[in-house]
């Protein structure tokens, strides 16, 4: 890739500013926001807070900042603007209903985004108060079964005692999880399962519409 790019003007982003034009160092977060340090090869450095959560979103900030640098926007302007980023619907949407916090991240999913979501939740979620509603990931071809097994294993290992509900036939029979074929089938079980103070996180591929497992006000 480096060889192929030799004839082009290349801007790099990542976590180490000594190797990149722009770097973002994640400083931790909560359900509704996070902090990160945005650094530029030219020496500017900013500690920022924004409404997005997760290490993966800090990397996205670095990518956006690198593009801005490429078109000539000054670092100070980039830093002032990036903190106003907001996600569209069904992407980490937080709703609190009757003492329960619902996170609707149901717009889409793939193995990488599922891993990122679980890693983010692990920063602050109490496994004993966590309910995961995970919809199947589509268009995985021959790796479908293995990826869904790995997702369930990751969830159960990361959050001992978690209440795990899977939606979609791609999951197959997964010990430790309640299995449903369709998102609408989850509603009644979820209503009986949640308790005051719980955190419910829902994510899956767009085709499984896992938001339909949540109360209507949280969709």
Language-model region placement:
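ATP-dependent carboxylate/acyl-activation modules
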Residues: 89-92, 210-215
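Short amphipathic alpha-helix with an adjacent loop that forms part of the alpha/beta core around
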Residues: 187-195
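Hydrophobic "anchor" residues on beta-strands that sit immediately upstream
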Residues: 100-104, 131-132, 199
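Acidic, Mg2+-coordinating active-site environments of NTP-dependent enzymes
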Residues: 1-101, 126-128, 153-163, 169-176
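Active-site beta-alpha connecting loops in nucleotide-dependent enzymes
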Residues: 87-90, 106-179, 183, 205
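A short, gly/pro- and small-residue-rich
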Residues: 9-14, 213-219
